[in-house]
A protein has these predicted regions:
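Flavin-dependent oxidoreductase catalytic core characteristic
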Residues: 1-696
């Protein structure tokens, strides 16, 4: 009888031991002291949730949006499937008559950047904000119709955060009214450019503008790089993919070099600055600060994105920790149907300490991101009136918050993965690939350490202005407010006498404000009075930016709850969450609070005690709180974070889909295994089925 090697490996139909995951999660959900759906509506809005359901019903039945094979794909397969998704999305927008919100929801739910991502996220927004009316017709309108596909080429092989150090040049040629793009060195290669490797036929290229012999620094140009006829690179352009990366491998990040490549005058994006045809005379922007508004918007949206990253990671880890049972707690044995069973991992204090503050951080980032968008919109209105008073504080805070919150998210995703134990190491957890793809956030749109310098420069300048009486408290400038309060009493002490005093929002805000102000004051003293160089102060610079932004996160969370239109039960749960976030942050940063003299040793002990109390109070609401994030299983794509709790069944089903399990015998058997197994063996020692006989 011949052997059929094409029979896939299947698990026997058995049930997991112990209480079913579905029942365990149902038990957790029954503990909710608030209305989960109402909290979801408060966070997202009823209309947005309805649109998400509508879009989900469509894409979950679309082959191009199928995630089933995602964890088994090669890089080429991932890129190819990304193309299929992008093409089908364009078709669905027309077929379903989706608006911009619904289109964005479809991309959000698919949760994987694809080849066209940078066309939507960078190319089109730049064309909208930096072009003249003529250029909008020439570039933006066809881009919106996908008649041209673009990317944003700024970073180079030799320079990233130092934009002023970019080497690519764009020299104006008055005789032909053209610009000549050129890459003078190897390090001038544009590098890491998403969508450039194989997709884009146009690029926004940041190049040093040279006209009449003057180098005017980097400016944007809209440059055609590939033929619209056959997609081949144009003469004078060398372009390709940079190769496999730590993550983000569904996107064709690319490189490009220019060899005296001529482009027309209209390629220079001229909304804010102009080069006069024929003479090359340069007109600078009316206000250099105008470009800051776009940066604030991008960074505010990154903070909004952090809440989804934290929400996804904690939803998976908290649900799994409620289902996963390990050991029997002899001091407090868990019973199910009158039988002692193993304890859910989430009942262990250490697991609570690892996960619940991160749940709180997700909510903190929700409120802070929302507030940043509100302030951005307010600032746009004020700038139109010629009032730039809000811009400096908003720009500095958005820079620092981008740095702080994306670092928080990257660390939290990995912490949540580890909190899932051994199964967290499987891609099926939904956390490994997610972590890999999220990591670029800590370096793009400004390296996180370098961004803190922008924040710190503003903080130090503001401190000097407050000291000199040039800045007064304002509703919109919390930096001036806490610095003013600090200078009124630089020897202030924390008033806490019992652990529960730390639950007082005023106590919390005073502590965070004093700590931030103290750090700024000491840094200013070292730079201004002791002659310390900026480079020698970079560690402290990072600390004061971090302290300032932690103050903003805590304050925004607390103030938002004071103004929120929520019922008492929901407000009470969220207040516990806000307090946990604040006190856990204080505990992690204890050295700052102690060094400033604001906290004493006894108070730090009370602080630690109160953190544990808050963990106990938040624990029963853990699963309901992550359910309120309203993240569908399709989005999570996780065996461990399933809403029905059937994690073990999901793990085995995903293992069955592993391509290695599609056959019984591995393809390399004949070449690499059989020669060793058969060497020197005599067949009389083998049974008919190939088992080794026990007889000598």
């Amino acid at each position: 009888m011949s052997f059929d090697n094409n029979i896939p490996t299947k698990f026997p139909k058995l049930e997991p031991r112990g209480p079913a995951g579905e029942l365990l999660l149902a038990s957790e959900r029954a503990k909710a002291s608030f209305d989960v759906k109402e909290l979801s509506k408060f966070m997202y809005g009823e209309q947005w949730l309805a649109k998400m359901d509508k879009v989900l019903n469509v894409i979950s039945n679309e082959p191009a949006f199928d995630k089933t094979g995602r964890y088994y794909e090669s890089r080429q397969e991932r890129v190819a499937n990304g193309f299929k998704k992008d093409k089908r999305l364009i078709e669905l927008v027309k077929e379903q008559n989706w608006d911009e919100t619904e289109t964005n929801i479809a991309t959000f739910l698919y949760d994987q950047s694809t080849p066209f991502s940078l066309h939507y996220n960078m190319f089109i927004p730049t064309l909208r904000s930096q072009t003249t009316d003529e250029q909008k017709k020439l570039f933006l309108e066809p881009a919106l119709k996908h008649q041209i596909i673009g990317c944003y080429a700024q970073t180079e092989l030799g320079h990233g955060s130092n934009v002023q150090g970019l080497e690519t040049t764009a020299t104006y040629i008055p005789e032909t009214n053209e610009f000549e793009l050129h890459s003078p060195t190897l390090t001038a290669s544009k590098w890491w450019i998403g969508g450039l490797g194989k997709v884009a036929n146009h690029a926004i290229v940041m190049a040093r503008l040279i006209t009449n012999g003057k180098d005017l620094g980097p400016h944007p140009f809209c440059v055609q790089i590939r033929s619209l006829k056959d997609h081949r690179p144009l003469e004078g352009v060398t372009v390709g993919d940079i190769g496999p990366k730590f993550g983000f491998n569904s996107v064709d990040n690319g490189f490009i070099m220019f060899d005296h490549y001529r482009i027309p005058h209209v390629a220079f994006l001229a909304k804010y600055s102009q080069v006069k045809p024929g003479t090359g005379e340069y007109s600078k922007p009316p206000n250099a600060k105008l470009s800051y508004g776009t940066m604030v918007y991008v960074r505010a949206n990154i903070v909004m994105g952090v809440r989804y990253a934290l929400a996804k990671a904690t939803t998976i880890a908290v649900r799994y920790s409620a289902v996963r049972q390990q050991f029997v707690d002899s001091a407090n044995p868990k019973k199910w149907d009158n039988k002692v069973v193993e304890t859910p991992v989430l009942d262990y204090t250490m697991q609570q300490y690892r996960l619940l503050p991160t749940v709180a951080a997700a909510y903190a980032c929700f409120f802070t991101g929302t507030e940043m968008i509100r302030l951005y919109n307010l600032n746009q209105v004020e700038m139109q009136k010629g009032n730039f008073g809000l811009l400096a504080d908003l720009h500095a805070s958005s820079s620092g918050l981008k740095s702080l919150t994306t670092t928080m998210a990257a660390e939290a995703i990995e912490d949540c993965r580890r909190a899932c134990g051994g199964h967290g190491y499987s891609l099926f957890s939904g956390l490994g690939q997610f972590y890999q793809d999220y990591l670029p956030n800590v370096t793009w749109e400004g390296d996180n350490y370098i961004l803190t310098q922008q924040t710190a420069r503003y903080l130090l300048k503001t401190y000097r202005n407050v000291v000199a009486g040039k800045a007064v408290p304002s509703e919109y400038n919390q930096t001036v407010n806490y610095l003013t309060q600090y200078l009124q009493n630089t020897k202030a002490k924390c008033p806490v006498t019992v652990p529960t005093d730390f639950n007082n929002p005023e106590v919390i805000l005073a502590a965070f404000g004093f700590r931030a102000a103290y750090g700024i004051a000491k840094a200013a003293e070292q730079i201004d009075n002791q002659g310390r160089s900026w480079n020698s102060m970079l560690v402290e610079i990072n600390r004061i930016s971090r302290a300032h932004c932690q103050f903003l996160l805590v304050r925004t969370f607390i103030i938002a709850l004071q103004n929120a239109n929520l019922d008492k039960a929901t407000t009470a749960v969220l207040r516990n969450l806000a307090t946990l976030f604040a006190l856990h942050t204080m505990e992690k940063e204890l050295s700052d609070f102690l060094l400033s003299g604001y906290l004493n040793g006894d108070q730090t002990s009370m602080l630690k005690e109160q953190v544990i109390v808050l963990l106990e109070q938040v624990r029963p609401q853990a699963v309901p709180l992550v359910d309120a994030f309203a993240l569908p299983d399709y989005y999570l794509h996780s065996a461990l974070g399933r809403s029905d709790g059937n994690v073990y069944k999901a793990m085995t089903e995903m293992a069955e889909r592993e391509p290695l399990n599609h056959t019984q015998v591995v393809s390399s058997y004949e070449e690499c295994i059989k020669p060793f197994v058969h060497a020197g063996q005599t067949t009389d020692r083998w049974n008919e089925d190939g088992t080794l006989s026990a007889k000598l």
